[in-house]
Amino acid sequence: MSAEGVSEIEESQIQTNYDKVVYKFDDMNLKDELLKGVYGYGFEEPSAIQQRAILPIVEEHDVLAQAQSGTGKTGTFSIAALQRIDSSIKAPQALILAPTRELALQIQKVVIALAFHMDVKVHACIGGTSFVEDTEGLKDAQIVVGTPGRVSDNIQRHRFKTDNIKMFILDEADEMLSSGFREQIYQIFTMLPPTTQVVLLSATLPGDVLEVTTKFMRNPIRILVKKDELTLEGIKQFYINVEEEQYKFDCLSDLYDSISVTQAVIFCNTRRKVEELTQKLTESNFTVSSIYSDLPQQERDVIMKEFRSGSSRILISTDLLARGIDVQQVSLVINYDLPTNKENYIHRIGRGGRFGRKGVAINFVTNEDVGAMREIEKFYSTQIEELPADVAEMFT
């Protein structure tokens, strides 16, 4: 993950109330062992969001940072957290929340890699693991990465001592502060020391979320990317008008007959649709995996491992996967169903071109979906073109 691989953002597209910009990691006064980890991980120069957000977080400001997927958000808060913690104190000091178990594990991997030369323990507090593991892991981990339900449960059961917490970081804040998680976030916040620093990072921050942040952030530094730049660089976006729902599968089969793709993620809106499509593709001799939130954790882990290793070429998913899973080989994302929430669109198509890798997103649109697609175009100030006849050339 070099600086060359991170999508660049024009200076004119950054809005902020903080004027310090640091263009080199060497100039951030990072601990020597952390700096070694940063370079060892493959970072060369800080991305636009890292240039602007790492320093104010380290300086203990509350920070609200908006950047699209693939811009180095995870590196931003991971580096800042590792700089702030005291490794001699064997107790949780930074709490990082993520909306899904998979994203929490991804963040944990990044933090561990960056902390390679440091005496730091990172514990993942997530569903699907035993409470015994949490009890042991939470004793001496300086950084805890977790999902809201499991973290809240552990704090209430006094397994997670929050006395030393000084940073509360929410990744994918638009999802975390949506109605499903808002109450849990508030509950966790009331159980943290009153001086706790709050950091929110996300690809989208709609107005209602910005209002919510005023309830628990103190004079935050705001670093916002203008909305009309949020569509990912390097992602070619197309649609196919399938007219009616019943024609989607035939259209998908025709598409696969005409293109050669290493790996693809196909998004559906419901578990039932995922299961139906998986069955149909399997019957058509495709090697397919599928994943959704109701699947047992162990199965989800195995499926993701198989897909990352390349033994499975097609992954069919609900929006569970649409946030932050780093699958580098994916060149094609197909929205078999348009997302019901337009803010999930950027998270879905971000799977195809993370960190500068080029990708193609193809949306299957029924006659009824045309209005929703136009809304997505308007929301992101982008254009989704009709898929051209020479589509095969994009995958050669």
Curated annotation (Swiss-Prot):
Matching entries from Gene3D superfamilies are given as: P-loop containing nucleotide triphosphate hydrolases
Main localisation: cytoplasm
Q: Where in the cell is it found?
A: Cytoplasm
Where in this protein would one find the motif DEAD box, according to its record? 171-174
One function term, GO molecular function aspect: translation initiation factor activity
Provide the Helicase ATP-binding domain boundaries.
Answer: 54-223
Reactions catalysed, semicolon-separated, are: ATP + H2O = ADP + phosphate + H(+)
Q: What positions does the record give for the motif labelled Q motif?
A: 23-51
Q: How does it assemble?
A: Component of the eIF4F complex, which composition varies with external and internal environmental conditions. It is composed of at least eIF4A, eIF4E and eIF4G.
Q: What is known of its domains?
A: The Q motif is unique to and characteristic of the DEAD box family of RNA helicases and controls ATP binding and hydrolysis.
Q: What is the protein name for this chain?
A: ATP-dependent RNA helicase eIF4A
Question: What gene is behind this protein?
Answer: TIF1
